[in-house]
């Protein structure tokens, strides 16, 4: 397990060892974008912890889809998207790890090619800039 948390200041770094187990490393040194991509490509599973200031998807979620990686997330809204598959995305309730072992042992479930195309960087740019052709990337319908 190679898990390092980047802290933005000395204060959060000082609290690190009170909060996390010793096998989770801490650093004040950011890694480059290229190194981050390399680490993602080498990983079997990506982690995504939702911040309290947003409810939407993080780039980590989209990266997991694009790199065909399993994802462990605290964002319950991910289950509302068309790329969600329980073999690929484990939604952690931050209380128990029920089903995590089975999730990690199960193979990645390939999604339809159209899903990978829809959430690709090229399609995202084309959609945002309204450059045809592109696939519309809509938000899930809210429950009424």
Across the structure, where does each feature detected by a protein language model lie?
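Short alpha-helical segment that forms part of, or immediately flanks, the ligand-binding pocket
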Residues: 37, 60-66
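Short glycine/proline-centered loop/turn elements that form peptide/ligand docking sites
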Residues: 58-60, 71-82
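Conserved beta-strand scaffold positions in the cores of enzyme catalytic domains, especially
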Residues: 71, 89-91
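Acidic, glycine-centered active-site loop in nucleotide-sugar glycosyltransferases
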Residues: 83-89
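C-terminal "capping" alpha-helix adjacent to the active site of nucleotide-linked donor transferases
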Residues: 91-111
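A short, well-ordered alpha-helix in the C-terminal region of glycosyltransferases
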Residues: 108-123
């Amino acid at each position: 397990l190679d898990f390092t948390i980047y802290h933005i200041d000395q204060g959060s770094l000082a609290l690190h060892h009170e909060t996390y187990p010793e096998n989770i490393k801490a650093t004040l040194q950011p890694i480059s974008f290229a190194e981050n991509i390399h680490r993602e490509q080498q990983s079997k599973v990506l982690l995504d912890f939702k911040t309290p200031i947003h409810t939407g998807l993080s780039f980590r979620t989209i990266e997991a889809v694009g790199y065909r990686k399993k994802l462990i997330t605290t964002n319950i809204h991910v289950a509302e998207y068309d790329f969600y598959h329980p073999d690929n995305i484990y939604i952690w309730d931050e209380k128990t790890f029920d089903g995590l072992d089975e999730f990690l042992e199960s193979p990645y479930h390939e999604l339809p090619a159209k899903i990978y195309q829809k959430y690709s960087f090229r399609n995202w740019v084309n959609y945002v800039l309204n450059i045809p052709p592109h696939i519309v990337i809509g938000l899930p319908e809210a429950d009424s």
